[in-house]
Amino acid sequence: LRRLLVSLHNPVALRKGGTDMRAVLAILQRLRAGQNICLFAEGHTCFDGVTGPIPRGTATLARSAGATLVTYVVGGGYFTAPRWGRGFRRGRTWGEVKGIYPPEQLKAMTDAEIAAQLARDLHIDAAQEQQVNPVPYRGRRPAEGLENALYLCPRCLSFDSLRGEDNRLHCTACGTQAVYTPYGALEGDFGQSQIRDWVAWQRQTLAGMMAEEGFALKDEGQTLRQVQEDHKVREVAHGTLHMDRRHIRIGDWALPMDSLRGVAIFRKNRLLLTDSNGERYDFASDHVRSALKYKDMFELIKE
């Protein structure tokens, strides 16, 4: 399927985890050649069903491209194919044009104004949409993969103890359980009924933990690999991944937090880093562990 889509649409490849000027230049070249470009402004799909921040660079690109900007929002996609999940679910997906902005209008706007307009046009809250217009989304084993989004148990505060199996979510540490319904909600004893609210709660709770002296995220069985220009990887280190406010390290390899420029997640749970020299790394894990908690911690440090 991937090869078919590439051959049909000839997409512009974008490197995750940092700014990719080659992708920007490729977009500008195609626009100036009269081609249309579909750009997903967030740069990734979300884990919680809420449109994330729009990078300021996207606004800069829109203003300098000299092309008409059409904003289009897609609804239902989060429940049809949640980023954290496996497979597709049958349900309603819809789209709507929100705005059309000619080049002259964009030239008269600042980057901040364009970014704000993009945020307004593209904002969607999947859980809120379900409350207004409930739609069932049915599929096989719909709770599988929830641990990619949910890394902290609200009952026992254990990290990486949650597991989604079939249509159920449970904590391997305290035994708490819930059922994931066709409407994308949780019914059970966790005290959280919406993935959106759980994701926000765990990030806020992580921020409180980070205020404690000596707090660090740790995971054993991690392999650090450097990603080459040809996308091949070279193993750099293996051991326990450790991230605190000052460093991220594994084995004999360490990177000061000031030199960490970007943290991203590839697909569902592959952690990607970009340093100040533009070097890119990824982490492979020999067990279930969350990449999102490291991304959250990095963003909280940089706030």
Predicted regions and their residues:
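Short amphipathic C-terminal alpha-helix that caps PH/PH-like domains
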Residues: 5, 110-126, 289-303
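ATP/pyrophosphate-binding catalytic subdomain of soluble kinases
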Residues: 119-122, 126-142, 146-151
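Long, charge-rich boundary regions
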Residues: 177-255
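Soluble catalytic domains of membrane acyltransferases
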Residues: 1-116, 132-133, 140, 155-156, ...
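Acidic, Ser/Thr- and proline-rich intrinsically disordered linker/docking segments
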Residues: 259-303
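General beta-strand recognition
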Residues: 94, 170, 249, 270-272
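Cys/His-rich short segments
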Residues: 138-191
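Phosphoinositide-dependent membrane-docking surfaces
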Residues: 14, 241-270
